[in-house]
């Protein structure tokens, strides 16, 4: 397990990244059926690339060729499935507050990103 947090400010703003390696796919397979495919979302790929630069980490989330994701807008209390909804949250919202969980099929790895500004 890899975990890094950078929180601060009056409202506990910031970002958290957790990575879980060698996850038993059989334990989460029932969840993945309702998640979106990662290769259909350039927005999710962009978020994952920018997480490492936010922290200034040597650790870089690799490009995920095959997997699934679940993106939840914590401010609106709803799951975001379309690129239009994701772009509205990231580009046009005053309160960016989301949880992102990504499953990498090839590496059996889960990436969790919590972001609040």
Name each model-derived stretch.
Residues 8-9, 14, 56, 67:
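Residue-identity detector for glycine
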Residues 22-24, 114-117:
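Secondary-structure transition/turn motif
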């Amino acid at each position: 397990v890899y975990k890094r947090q950078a929180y601060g400010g009056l409202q506990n703003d910031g970002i958290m990244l957790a990575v879980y390696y060698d996850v038993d796919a059989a334990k989460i397979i029932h969840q993945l059926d309702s998640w979106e495919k990662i290769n259909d979302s350039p927005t999710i790929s962009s978020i994952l690339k920018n997480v490492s630069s936010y922290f200034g980490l040597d650790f870089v989330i690799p490009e995920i060729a095959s997997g699934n994701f679940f993106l939840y807008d914590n401010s609106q209390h709803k799951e975001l499935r379309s690129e239009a909804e994701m772009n509205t949250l990231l580009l046009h919202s005053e309160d960016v507050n989301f949880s992102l969980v990504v499953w990498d099929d090839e590496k059996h790895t889960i990436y969790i990103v919590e972001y609040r500004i």
